[in-house]
Amino acid sequence: MEKKSCMILALDVSDREEALKIAEDVSEFVDAIKVGYPLILATGLGIIRELAEFAPIIADFKVADIPNTNRLICEHVFEAGTDAVIVQGFTGRDSLDACIEIASEYGKDVFVVSEMSHPGGAEFLQPVGEAIARMAAEAGAFGLVAPATRPERVTTIRKIIGNKLTIISPGVGAQGGKASDVIAAGADWVIVGRAIYKAESPREAARKIAAEIEAEFEQEN
């Protein structure tokens, strides 16, 4: 995944035409599009190849099962044309290894959730988030998912993994996270959903957030 804008669109809409229109409108400002259950359950896996005309696709299925089932899920995900899959780490090393094994066969990537961005994410996942981050690095995952709503946790995770893994960070916009803060904290990409796809002009909303990120990099340099 090439880093240009450092922004990923979380396209959690349920209508095919709306999804394609938004993807086309904001493609200039995003490095990837993250799709999840709302869109896939409503439209089918076929939407992935259509969206891939505009940007690389990350399947946010938070895969969390036994190794054999994880392999089957990941096979279907990559056969559908996705470039990466998001999986849970709390299921353990063997389940994670199964996902990474299939991703390697397809030449694709795996992102592991260390912590989720909503308030409840601090209840059970945060206490084991650092252990999950270490496991993901040891297993050879491509990256981690860490919360933009808690930039200090992104900083902590970055210190643990160094530059071994990339960090993508959800929660910018509607959940209260600020793009510039989480980039400064150590994230490689921010994930933005409702602040873009629910905006009156998704393109303009994406442009403004991209400009905010660019300004943060200019300030750092």
Curated annotation (Swiss-Prot):
Substrate binds at residues 12, 34, 60-69, 117, 170-180, 193-194. Keywords: Decarboxylase, Lyase, Pyrimidine biosynthesis. It catalyses: orotidine 5'-phosphate + H(+) = UMP + CO2. It holds the Pfam family OMPdecase. One of its GO terms (biological process) is 'de novo' pyrimidine nucleobase biosynthetic process. SUPFAM superfamilies: Ribulose-phoshate binding barrel. Pathway: Pyrimidine metabolism; UMP biosynthesis via de novo pathway; UMP from orotate: step 2/2. PROSITE patterns: OMPDECASE. The active site is at K62 (proton donor). Its EC number is 4.1.1.23. One of its GO terms (molecular function) is orotidine-5'-phosphate decarboxylase activity. NCBIfam families: PRK13813.1 (NF010386), pyrF (TIGR01740). HAMAP family: OMPdecase_type1_A. Homodimer. This is Orotidine 5'-phosphate decarboxylase. The lineage of its organism: Archaea, Methanobacteriati, Methanobacteriota, Stenosarchaea group, Methanomicrobia.
